[in-house]
Amino acid sequence: MSLPGFIHHSPALQDSRQPAPFDYGRALSLREMARHYTELPKYLLAPEVSALLHYLPDWEQHALINTLWNTGARLNEALALRRRDFHLSEAIPHVVIRTAKQRRTAGGRPKKGKSANRVVPLSDPAYVDEMRRLFASTRERFEEDADTGERRAMPVWGVTDRTVRNWIERAVSAAERDGVRFSIAVSPHTFRHSFAMHLLYGHVHPKVLQGLMGHEKSESTE
């Protein structure tokens, strides 16, 4: 079965964040045009991401890949997220993502004019519910600093970069066994590009997108 056919016959895979009917055919045409320009990032469309998530039945694996898709986080940023970074009960649910540099300096003061963290709104209610269920069913883990004795919260996902890549590879292979094939090679960074393109399709201003992506320079977003 082709991927468009798979999505068409799976209503649950339709993206809940789309405010208007998603023109999948037009989006595919635009992406096909972009493929001729090798400097442009490779990305999946929202229904394709949903199809891939379908092949991640493990709860924690699904939640992590869904986090990459819903936040645009780099993999190292997502793997550093702690439970306290998720604010799921606020009027506007959001996650606070710390930069790698800020994590290395243990939360020290950032340079003047620069923000150490970025706040990403979580606009998909299904994803927010998924994270609530995950936190309700698992215990938060802590570690003690050997030098100071300070008790610190550990990341939600205690796995390596390679492990996450293996999860994705297995999901892609499972999809292929069902005849569902993706037009690009899928990696953790694919979801960051997909997040950005999804917001652009939703007419989010590039300056806002720049902030959500954590890019210091607009050229990085462009």
Please describe what each predicted stretch is:
Residues 86-90, 185, 204-222:
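Short, polar N-cap/turn motifs at the start of nucleic acid-interacting alpha helices
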Residues 30-35, 120-170:
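Major-groove DNA-contacting interfaces characterized by cationic-aromatic clusters
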Residues 81-131:
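Conserved tyrosine-mediated DNA breakage-rejoining catalytic core shared by Y-recombinases
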Residues 68-91, 207-208:
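Short, charged phosphate-coordinating catalytic segments
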Residues 143-146, 166-211:
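Short, basic (Lys/Arg/His-rich) helix/loop patches that form interaction surfaces
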Residues 46-75:
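Basic, Lys/Arg- and aromatic-enriched nucleic-acid-binding interface segment
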Residues 1-32, 74-76, 170:
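N-terminal DNA-binding recognition helix of tyrosine site-specific recombinases/integrases
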Residues 21-50, 105-125, 142:
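DNA breakage-rejoining catalytic core of tyrosine-based enzymes
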